[in-house]
Amino acid sequence: MSSGGLLLLLGLLTLWAELTPVSSKDRPEFCELPPDRGTCMGFLQAFYYNPSQNKCLPFMFGGCKANPNNFKTLEECKRTCAA
């Protein structure tokens, strides 16, 4: 196989790996935790993974001391937890 063909194959495999969703067996355990507002009194939009709906949802975060199922962006939540 030529070097161009190998590069194309490598590129396709990399793309496939990036687009393959997280399976439930590979999902971190903290993705199962309920949303946690934290102990501070702020009003920041954050996202958490909801396992019963199998998707990331917004919630209001107080700004500190929450559990790890707390993401600044929807994309970060999906990349980490969504299948």
Curated annotation (Swiss-Prot):
Keyword Signal attached: yes
Disulfide bonds: C31-C81, C40-C64, C56-C77
Species for this entry: Demansia vestigiata
Subcellular location: Secreted
Gene Ontology MF terms in the entry: serine-type endopeptidase inhibitor activity
Family: Belongs to the venom Kunitz-type family.
Annotated site (Reactive bond for chymotrypsin): M41, G42
Annotated PANTHER family: BPTI_KUNITZ INHIBITOR DOMAIN-CONTAINING PROTEIN, KUNITZ-TYPE PROTEASE INHIBITOR-RELATED
SMART domains in the cross-refs: KU (SM00131)
Signal peptide: 1-24
Record-linked PROSITE patterns: BPTI_KUNITZ_1, BPTI_KUNITZ_2
GO CC list: extracellular space
Tissue: Expressed by the venom gland.
Coiled-coil boundaries: none
Record keyword Chloroplast present: no
One Pfam family hit: Kunitz_BPTI
Top-rank taxon: Eukaryota
Record keywords: Disulfide bond, Protease inhibitor, Secreted, Serine protease inhibitor, Signal
Domain BPTI/Kunitz inhibitor: 31-81
Name of protein: Kunitz-type serine protease inhibitor vestiginin-1
Role of this protein: Serine protease inhibitor.
Main location: secreted
